[in-house]
C-alpha cells in the first residue's frame, strides 16, 4: 500500500514501530548467544549494510528492561509469557549497542533518545513532534 511506510512527499514524517537497527541488534544478540555462526552473522551484516536504506532520524524511546518486563506481565499475552528480565536486558543492551554503532557511520541518521518512563502516549507523541523539528 503506497504511503504506508514511505512518505508521499520529501517533507513527510513517517513513523515506524521499530527501527531497522533492531534487526542488527537481534542478530548481534543471537550471534552472541551462539545461535548464529560467524559466517552467518557476517553474511547478515553485509546484506544489512547493502540493502537497508537509512532513515533521516532515529528516535529511540528509552525504558528500563524491568519496566518492560512488568508491562509484559500486566498485558498477559501468551507470546510474551516466556520473557525474562535477563532476556530483555540482553535485548536492551544489544539495541543500544547497535544504535551507537550505527550512529558512528558516515551519513548515519541522527540519533535522538527520549526517556519515556512515566509519560503518557500523548506526551510521547508531542515530544517526538518537537524533536522532529530540531
Predicted features by range, described:
Residues 1-37, 59:
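A basic- and aromatic-enriched beta-loop-alpha substructure that forms the phosphate/nucleotide-
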Residues 2-5, 9, 47-50, 102:
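Short, flexible, glycine/charge-rich loop motifs used to bind or transfer phosphoryl groups or to couple energy/partner
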Residues 9, 53, 109:
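Structured loop/turn residues at beta-strand edges in well-structured enzyme cores
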Residues 13, 44, 58-59, 116, ...:
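Weak global preference for isoleucine
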Residues 17, 58-62, 111-113:
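Short beta-strand segments at enzyme active-site cores
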Residues 20-23, 64-66, 118-120:
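Short, solvent-exposed loop/turn segments at secondary-structure junctions
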Residues 25-94:
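A glycine- and Lys/Arg-enriched "phosphate-lid" helix/loop adjacent to the NTP-binding pocket
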Residues 69-134:
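NTP-dependent small-molecule kinase module
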